[in-house]
Amino acid sequence: MVMHSEDEPYKCKFCGKAFDNLHLYLTHERTHTGEKPYECNKCGKAFSCSSSIRKHARIHTGEKPYICKQCGKAFRYSSSIRNHENTHTGEKPCECKQCGKAFSYSSYFRIHERIHTGEQVYKCKECGKTFTYPSAFHKHKSTHTSQKLYECKECGKAFDCFSSFHSHEGVHTGEKPYECRTWKSLQ
């Protein structure tokens, strides 16, 4: 049953948080129920809100609509370009209160905080193993399936890990985002 009031007509039956927008209310309640009604038709990953699946689809299409005005690098998400812009300014707005380490990216900061809390937010549904870092969790999930989720449009090679797929893309584009300082100094 949805509770209504004049100012905040939608109140969460699980935690009491109130909303004045039905869409935000329904999306919030899914954080409690775990309901994920929006499923990707490419890889089967499910989402609790429609905007998340639209953003996710860019992984499969390769679309990167956000372009950095300083260096031309393209990004899938608006949050990624905002964080990237800090690399040009050197700004590191996210500082850990526990150890003082600072980060350009808020997502890196949130992951770093888990070092101090020991929090393991990723749990494998297959075996129950828990993980602190999303990269380790996603890599682990591939041990339970032989399905390859990321396929190269150029050559057809498939990968179960996005980071491996992304690195492979450089074979076709010639992009080499990581340079060896030692090798460069020898040239």
Swiss-Prot record:
Give, as residue ranges, the zinc fingers classified C2H2-type: 10-32, 38-60, 66-88, 94-116, 122-144, 150-172
Q: Which keywords does this chain's UniProt record carry?
A: Metal-binding, Repeat, Zinc, Zinc-finger
Q: Does the keyword Metal-binding apply?
A: yes
Q: Could you cite one Gene Ontology molecular function of this protein?
A: DNA-binding transcription factor activity
* GO process terms (BP): regulation of gene expression
Q: Does the record carry Chloroplast as a key word?
A: no
Q: What is this protein called?
A: Putative zinc finger protein 833
Q: What SUPFAM superfamilies is this protein classified in? A: beta-beta-alpha zinc fingers
What do the Gene Ontology cellular component annotations say? nucleus
Disulphide linkage map = none
